[in-house]
């Protein structure tokens, strides 16, 4: 998804907003994260509806097409309740999730199923990203391998 972001930024006719949603989801938290990347503060507003209206108004006033990337979505939610207006000429949404069910419930138009790496490939990638200089020995190697296993090829 970072690759998509960089590609869109190169085109220069998009405003790309990247928000990591994570497992501890709430509408208010997502609204705050979106507001933060937009450079506004919603903390003085308590009502979800008011916060959603403010976000919708900001999105509508943007001159460039907004591409909102919601990364690491764990559960479905109502886009309108958050304040995300989906309009082909104003705002488009890309979301990443491990759950096809989440995509279906949010009514994603297109779904791309990414293949995971097998354990050997994941370990090789981990070592490559670590760099050639540091060598993992003893406990560090076992901890690193447990991290690779926990990521499950993602």
Where are these regions (language model features)?
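Conserved, well-structured core segments
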Residues: 17-20, 29, 67-68, 94-95, ...
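Non-catalytic, charged helical/coil tracts that couple and regulate nucleotide-powered enzyme cores
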Residues: 34-46, 89-91, 99-154
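Mid-core helix/loop region of P-loop NTP-binding domains shared across ATPases and GTPases
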Residues: 26-33, 43-69, 74, 139, ...
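Post-nucleotide-binding-loop coupling segment downstream of the phosphate-binding loop, primarily
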Residues: 1-54
